[in-house]
Amino acid sequence: MKIGRQSKIVELISKHNIETQEELADLLVKAGYRVTQATISRDIRELKLTKVATDNGKQKYIVLTNQESGMSEKYIRILRDGFVSMDMAQNIIIVKTVSGMAMAVAAALDALHIEGIVGCIAGDDTIMCAIRTVPDTISVMEKLSKLINGNK
């Protein structure tokens, strides 16, 4: 049952731009599966699904390959370990880090390929992230907050 459901989830995600757990649950119900929000949440975690930005500014679930998932987790851990605070100035995000961690955190940000970040410059405890537009800056800050707080 679980294997079949999770296979169906992967299939649905590859065919549809699914933004929320509710959308995924609705599609699973239409496909004949009885699911709860807790089941969906557990499946998302076990399948290592993540959200990425689409071209129209929305988000969708995708399945990371094992290599991408493992590396992504390492970069997120570096981000969490080094992060102190962040603030925005127009289309620039200033990230404060633990002393000596700015280079590692900036490299992690670059490696995560977060939509909207043009590039990062790091000092000892401060990173300047250039963002494409002001609205993108707000979106990137939200994504970073989710990553840092454990909500991919």
Curated annotation (Swiss-Prot):
GO terms for biological process: L-arginine biosynthetic process; protein complex oligomerization; regulation of arginine biosynthetic process. GO terms for molecular function: arginine binding; DNA binding; DNA-binding transcription factor activity. It comes from the Bacteria. Pfam families: Arg_repressor (PF01316), Arg_repressor_C (PF02863). It is found in: Cytoplasm. Keywords: Amino-acid biosynthesis, Arginine biosynthesis, Cytoplasm, DNA-binding, Repressor, Transcription, Transcription regulation. One of its GO terms (cellular component) is cytoplasm. Gene3D superfamilies: 3.30.1360.40, Winged helix-like DNA-binding domain superfamily/Winged helix DNA-binding domain. Pathway: Amino-acid biosynthesis; L-arginine biosynthesis [regulation]. Regulates arginine biosynthesis genes. Belongs to the ArgR family. This is Arginine repressor.
